[in-house]
Amino acid sequence: MKLTMLGTANSAMVPVYGCDCSVCGAAREDSNLRREKSSAYLEHNGKFLLLDANAPDLMCRFPAGLIDKILLTHYHMDHVHSLFDLRWGAGDKISVISPDDPLGCDDLYKHPGILDFSLRAQAFKSFDWQGITITPLPLNHSKLCLGYCFEFDGKRLAYLTDTVGLPKQTERWLKEFPVDWLITDCNYSPIEDPQARASLNHNDFHHILDIDETCRPTNLGLIHVSHHMLGWAEQHPQAFSERLRILNDGEEITL
């Protein structure tokens, strides 16, 4: 199975509109440094499973018939907005598997078009896609949110966004079933103020170190990064390693 990162930034993307910091300036000059909103796709047996649906070129990148299913982490707009265009397509239905959020996002449930929202993922209740076992894992976020662990041929990859820390039951699961890759959001550089940390809705780098120590993944990849986090990373290269690093748009992980 192969996972490809469609985007690795937070909702502001990189470069941030109107920002003249060094990270955003470099991204304007070099398109390879640009980052779209975090999402990915899994490729296996010639089929494609989208993880969230926010890529600006989604319908061009995946022509009709190429998307087998869509797997949503949650219904915040920055993770689903491409569905609002995709739903008005023609042809076969596309199944969208999502957390059992009764509100969804705006009028997607009311006017689904070619999208089928009838399948709901439940925490720790595994299901199969193309021979890959997918286990939904609860996350800590302001909207009902699930990460997903993909297992094939003895290898595991966990895609866990959006979250601030991990629920205890998810930590226990990841300790019982160690993963080769854990991919999660790191929106913030280390925040020292306890009050500020208590109000977070995404991981800071302290959370990443805690997750690493508790869950002990073989590799830990960071996504949903802000331009501030990227600037901090440039100034603190010693905080990263070959096994703990920020992922890039277009990066592929094959297991």
Regions found by a protein language model. Give the residues of each.
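Glycine/Thr-rich phosphate-binding loops of Rossmann-like dinucleotide-binding domains
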Residues: M13, M59, V80-H81, D106, ...
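Active-site metal-binding motif and surrounding structural segment of the metallo-beta-lactamase
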Residues: G46-I97, P178-D180
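Divalent metal-coordination and catalytic microenvironments
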Residues: L3, H74, I134, Y148, ...
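Cap/insert and terminal regions of metallo-dependent hydrolase folds
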Residues: G165-T254
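Active-site metal-binding loops of divalent metal-dependent hydrolases
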Residues: T8-A9, A53-A55, Y75, L139-H141, ...
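Conserved beta-strand hairpin/beta-sheet module of binuclear metal-dependent hydrolase folds
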Residues: M1-R61, C145-T161, W181
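Metallo-beta-lactamase
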Residues: K93-L146, E151-D153, L244-I253
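Short amphipathic alpha-helix with an adjacent loop that forms part of the alpha/beta core around
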Residues: C60-A64, F127-Q130, T170-E176, L255
